[in-house]
Amino acid sequence: MAVAYADKPNHFINFPLTQFEGFVLNYKGLQFQLLDEGVDCKIQTAPHISLAMLDIQPEDYRSVDVAIQEVIDDMHWGEGFQIKFDNPHILGRCIVLDVKGVEELHDDLVNYIRDKGCVADQSRKWIGHCTIAQLTDAALSIKENVDFINSMQFNYKITINPSSPARLEIVKLGAEKKDGFYETIVSHWMGSRFEYNPPTDKLAMIMGYCCSEVVRKELEEGDLPENDDDAWFKLSYHYENNSWFFRHVYRKVLISVSLVNLDCNCLGFYESPVEED
């Protein structure tokens, strides 16, 4: 089957950087150097990494949202990982930094989003970068500007772990910027779901169940939509969007859903034969 590419993207997966104060201080230092040198350019006011380009419609938001959560839930943190920024240079009309350390995250996002049937990534090879500024055509044609940009130095590392302020977001191309961030459709803190204790008593009560019928009995009447798919989706969003539910309940459901209307073990409060990941 041919792979569909987002060569005419309308959204992207964003990794914002404004919340990393040390990085931003050095990043703005580069921008000041450009302005001080008189380079005619438009400064980027929302530093970020574009991790994957998307060609999606509003009806795809839910699928991409869930894919992002699954990527976060499946991360093997260990001691975390580092993102390295260096080598200021010109890419097209932009002045950018090379970004290393997020290649695996990019691949995971693309694969998980494609598994949901959505179009992600472009036919050209993805290159991790962080835009500093965009040059005007006139500035790009001035040799002194090019030489100055090529002489600039930058080297900075950010460590990402479950307690860092890292986020993954769905952003529409052309979205407004405010206070260093893009307006987002979805934004998830990468560490917010790295928690193996039930976030609420109610989720603790239903954690071993594999079908919506028993879950409905534990919740208040009308808490869940009548449609099972919609019910599971709402549960995954319950209580401040904590995806703990995905790890401990939802994946069992994907396997045992065919048994829901037959002989569900939950009705007898037996342990599910399906092993957890």
UniProtKB/Swiss-Prot annotation:
Coiled-coil portions: none
InterPro entries reported in the protein's UniProt record: Coronavirus_NS2A, NS2A-like
Pfam families: Corona_NS2A
Recorded superkingdom: Viruses
Gene3D superfamilies hit by this protein: Cyclic phosphodiesterase (3.90.1140.10)
Family statement: Belongs to the coronaviruses ns2a protein family.
Protein name, UniProt field: Non-structural protein 2a
Organism: Bovine coronavirus (strain Quebec)
